[in-house]
Design a protein with these regions (language model features):
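Membrane-embedded alpha-helical bundles that constitute the cytochrome b-like, heme-associated redox core
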Residues: 2-292
Length: 292
């Protein structure tokens, strides 16, 4: 009798919702309102994919910006001042960089929060996943496990870097960055950060392409193989570029260690100012520091 009462209650329409028949109620078929509510996990999953893609694109651009030190110290200095608004303001404004970093931090925290939904929430869930992974022995499942741990590491490593850029945006320059990396003993953190971010980003882009069917073609298996090759090439290229760039900053930091704290001054601008000749236009704006 209690079972009959429960079925009747479940089949009763609530707040204008169409009535469920007794057979559906007995089988436990969810109501339409519950089906509508179940769309939220899919929306959050889409938001996680979008935030991850935006962060990956930012990291690609960021790597090319910081690697400009391989071209010359002046090239990196010019790019740093450009992002402080030197090209269109009377003088560079480091707070512009802080604003950009703040947006990146917000996106980073959003992506981390969305990703935490899929982490094992208890030791029991962790054990179940490990058993599942060992039974399947599927490469993509293993990649997700690697991505989970690199993401966990990034939560701490990237936060240190972002906080420094947020609070001290004026200390971005050839000498300043090299001093922070070498004299400030930050190079181990940057080395770990480099491996974590490139491995995590490469796997993330690969899984995004698989999930949304990008670049797979008519043959899914052949498309998956192409994506694996692209993922490997992506990670190797940016790891190589990052290691060479970090080595360049370390070498500059070693050479500049006895003058740590000295700000970089462009040679051309310094010589002209010493000769009481001021460069004009965009060249002068890009060569100035705040307050000069």
């Amino acid at each position: 009798m209690a079972s009959s009462l429960e079925q009747a209650t479940a089949a009763r329409p609530v707040s204008g919702e169409p009535a469920m028949n007794a057979a559906d109620a007995a089988r436990g078929v969810p109501s339409r309102s519950r089906l509508r509510a179940s769309r939220w996990p899919a929306r959050l999953d889409l938001l996680q994919s979008l935030s991850g893609l935006l962060l990956a694109l930012f990291l690609i651009a960021h790597m090319f910006f910081v690697s400009s030190i391989l071209v010359s110290q002046q090239a990196f200095y010019t790019i740093a001042r450009f992002f402080e608004g030197a090209a269109f303001l009377a003088e560079p404004r480091p707070w512009i960089v802080s604003c950009v970093v703040g947006v990146v931090m917000a996106l980073f925290m959003l992506h981390a929060w969305l990703a935490l939904r899929k982490f094992p929430a208890s030791f029991r869930q962790y054990r179940i996943f490990i058993e599942h992974k060992e039974q399947l022995r599927h490469s993509d499942t293993g990649l997700w496990w690697v991505q989970l741990w690199t993401g966990f590491a990034l939560f701490f490593l990237a936060s240190v870097h972002l906080f420094g850029m947020l609070t001290q945006p004026e200390l971005i320059g050839p000498y300043e960055s090299a001093d922070r990396i070498w004299t400030g003993n930050m190079w181990p953190i940057y080395l770990l950060l480099l491996f974590a971010v490139e491995i995590h980003g490469g796997i993330g882009l690969y899984r995004l392409a698989l999930k949304w069917g990008w670049l797979q073609g008519a043959d899914p298996l052949a498309g998956r193989r192409r994506l694996r090759i692209a993922r490997t090439c992506f990670s190797l290229f940016f790891l190589g570029l990052g290691l060479v760039t970090l080595l360049a900053y370390v070498q500059l930091g070693i050479a500049h260690a006895d003058r740590a704290g000295e700000r970089y001054v462009p040679h051309k601008a310094a010589s002209r100012l010493a000769g009481h000749e001021r460069p004009g236009g965009l060249e002068f704006a890009l060569s100035r520091r705040p307050g000069e």
